[in-house]
């Protein structure tokens, strides 16, 4: 618990989304990004835990994959009426034989990608890999958690809700030396 609390790092906070409150952003869309083998439900247990904990805080949380997204029959304005905040939960683990991991969006048109960051507040939580900002430089609020387990998810929620301050100091350059990741 102590390690999780002291390691989670607020890398980028350009939107001042934090702390989260159900009054400010009651309806959350949760997007899972992972290279892990999925259980039958299709959702990692840590993602399910995050959803459950946020719901206990008073948020209405739904999975992006279960809903509609902007297209010909469902406008961006309609999407914004049912979504106040998008949370990306990334758990892309590297291995000894695969040291470079890049995000590949699940759907053909990249609907789950952060292409609506100028229209909707978006929060990117990176578990297990501190370099995802390279793939999502447009995201304005980005947090590194370094490992994916229940203890870290609990600690993350405490920080998101403002009950625990971010104490982590990145052991690497999460901006990867790129200018656009800092925007």
Q: How would you name each of these model-derived features?
A:
Residues 1-183:
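Preference for extracellular/luminal or secreted protein segments
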């Amino acid at each position: 618990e102590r390690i999780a609390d002291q390691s989670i790092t607020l890398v980028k906070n350009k939107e001042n989304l934090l702390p989260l409150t159900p009054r400010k952003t009651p309806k959350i869309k949760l997007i899972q990004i992972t290279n892990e083998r999925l259980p039958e439900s299709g959702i990692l247990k840590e993602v399910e835990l995050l959803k459950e904990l946020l719901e206990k805080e008073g948020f209405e949380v739904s999975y992006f994959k279960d809903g509609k997204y902007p297209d010909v029959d469902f406008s961006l304005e309609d999407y914004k009426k049912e979504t106040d905040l998008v949370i990306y939960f990334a758990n892309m683990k590297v291995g000894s034989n695969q040291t470079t991991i890049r995000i590949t969006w699940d759907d053909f048109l990249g609907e789950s990608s952060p292409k609506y960051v100028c229209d909707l507040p978006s929060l990117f939580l990176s578990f297990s890999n501190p370099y995802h900002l390279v793939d999502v430089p447009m995201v304005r609020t980005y947090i590194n958690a370094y490992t994916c387990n229940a203890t870290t998810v609990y600690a993350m929620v405490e920080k998101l809700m403002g009950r625990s301050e971010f104490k982590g100091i990145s052991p690497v350059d999460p901006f990867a030396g790129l200018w656009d990741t800092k925007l």
